[in-house]
Amino acid sequence: RRMKEITIFTPTYNRANLLTRLYQSLKMQTCREFQWLIVDDGSTDDTKNMVEKFIQDDEIAIKYYYQKNSGKHVAHNLGVKMCDTELFCCVDSDDSLTNDAVQTVLECWRKKTTDEKTLLSGIVAYRGYNTEKIIGTEFPAGMNEAALKDLYANGKKGDTALVYRTDVLRQYPFP
């Protein structure tokens, strides 16, 4: 198997009932250059067994870590620590991805030169309810590269999907 380029990270706590939907969306990805990294923050439901079944399916690359309940920020920091890909994207257990999400992100990233990548902390993408309806407003016209705060200062409203360079997240862990 090829080296993966992006980690889809999911912190979870007692969300076994929701993980299957996300798993199904990951199996449908048109690009498989990702791994799914799950940090279980002390679940007492069927999360561990469910993830073990996903791993046995062997359809996508999955890494699973269990920690005693410590909070989402601690789970996030562990995810970043255990990540071995250039890019890191947090996708919550109650979310799912469009079939081309990984492909779209990687195509965008691959167009950047190494020098350009060092100037960027990552990629901001739309989040939506489905492929037709985004959450909030479109990005301001002409703002292809900007700091996140500048997007919002220039009229962007609503939630976004954030894909970060893993090395940047390592420099700035959650307190």
Language-model region placement:
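Short aromatic/hydrophobic "clamp" motif used to bind/position activated sugar donors
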Residues: 88
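Cell-envelope/extracellular polymer assembly enzymes that use nucleotide-activated donors
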Residues: 4-7, 35
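Conserved donor NDP-sugar-binding/catalytic core segment of glycosyltransferases
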Residues: 100-135
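Short beta-strand/loop segment that forms part of the nucleotide-sugar
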Residues: 33-42, 63-68
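Glycine-rich, basic loop-to-helix element that forms the pyrophosphate-binding segment
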Residues: 67-83
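Short, well-formed alpha-helical segments that are part of the catalytic scaffolds
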Residues: 15-28
